[in-house]
Amino acid sequence: MTNLKNLRGMVDLLPAQSQGWQKVESIALEHFSRAGLQEIRTPIIEQTELFSRGIGENTDVVGKEMYSFDDRGGRSCTLRPEGTASVARSIVQHGLLNKGPQRLWYRGPMFRYERPQAGRQRQFHQIGVEFVGLASVISDAEVISIAWNFLKDVGLNELTLEINSLGSNEDRNIFKEELKDWLNQRFDLLDEDSQKRINVNPLRILDSKNNSTKELLSEAPSLIDFLSNESKTRFDYLQELLVNLKIPYEINYNLVRGLDYYSHTAFEITSDHLGSQATVCGGGRYDGLISELGGPQAPSIGWAIGMERLIILAGDKILQSKSPDVYVIHKGKKAEQLALEITCQLRSSNLIIELDYSGSSFSKQFKRADKSRAKWALVIGEDEVSKGQLLMKKLRDKQKDEESREYIFSKSDLDQLIKKLIAEKK
């Protein structure tokens, strides 16, 4: 019989890692709540047309990477490859902009058929932020600061913020024609992928990872030289705001992002510790997406962070699981019942309690308690039950005297024990 395994690029999140993910998500919830953001959750499966219209038919995501299929009703459906288009669709469908600008965040799995590698899987997870209905450059700076400070809250320090201006649609159209002419004159010097992109999506060539093409592009026309005065003013003001916020940045004139809906501000936060997959966070302004999907004209800006890459960068510190406050050891039928009762009482006070279910000897249960890294062991045997007493033994700080590591108390004193344990946690 064939052993069933997960599909390539679809990774199980095991208990040893899940607590680290929960910690990151709890930091996100607290951080975004302080920023006045509200969470939105959208379906994993959407109509394929949403992404072909929203992301762009000529992008790599739509052309090569989407998981698309026809359902039993003959409708073309796609596992979402990113979150912004789904959020935009939901805003339009439910008329959320009738209530004013929307400041939203989301989280969840996304799907792209790519070659799996560290930090890039076919099912991957994102946390993202979207400001919809806000045109001000101040909103650009705030969105970037939320990403920057969130990553700092998670414990990431060695990061680089890269910014660029993609200008308006008019700016880009003029630049595209100039760039295409320049590239066509050097067609034979380009790598194969770039040759295919010249007439389809020439801006993506600026982001080529091919070394010879990158060297050639150092002499290419720059989008910054084709920006209107209005676009230049926006970009200059963004830089001024970032300086005021004490957020260091670098200008990367070849930063274009991979999706067609971006305009004006584009940015990435990168790390040198991720190898070729250096981008931790990417985003930008998308002023035409909402109207493209049938909604009103609604200037917007947002970003997404890849959870897998964030967890890799955070390292062992974020993955450390929380140790129990108390490991409950028991032996005997009556002791078992009392152990369950007290475990539930302690948990109701927000203490982390692990109850032993093995029924093995006290010595083996103590070994498991030590392995759990619990601070205390609560010991309940038949003798303790008959005497109406409970025994607490300190499992850590073993350098202290034995007497200070052991406490005997009655069940009626449980409230005092709870207060003691809570005080220790603070």
From Swiss-Prot:
Q: Does the keyword Nucleotide-binding apply?
A: yes
Q: Which reaction does it catalyse?
A: tRNA(His) + L-histidine + ATP = L-histidyl-tRNA(His) + AMP + diphosphate + H(+)
Give the signal sequence positions: none
Record key words, sorted: Aminoacyl-tRNA synthetase, ATP-binding, Cytoplasm, Ligase, Nucleotide-binding, Protein biosynthesis
Q: What is its EC number?
A: 6.1.1.21
Return the GO cellular component terms, semicolon-separated.
cytoplasm
The UniProt entry, under InterPro entries, shows: aa-tRNA-synth_II, aa-tRNA-synth_II/BPL/LPL, Anticodon-bd, Anticodon-bd_dom_sf, His-tRNA-ligase, HisRS-like_core, HisRS/HisZ, HisRS_anticodon
> What biological-process terms (Gene Ontology) are attached?
histidyl-tRNA aminoacylation
User: GO molecular function, one example?
Assistant: ATP binding
Can you say where in the cell this protein is located?
A: Cytoplasm
Coarsely, its chief localization is cytoplasm
Q: Does the keyword Electron transport apply?
A: no
Pfam families for the chain: HGTP_anticodon, tRNA-synt_His
Q: Which family does it belong to?
A: Belongs to the class-II aminoacyl-tRNA synthetase family.
Could you describe the subunit structure of this protein? Homodimer.
Protein name, entry field: Histidine--tRNA ligase
Source species of the chain: Prochlorococcus marinus (strain NATL2A)
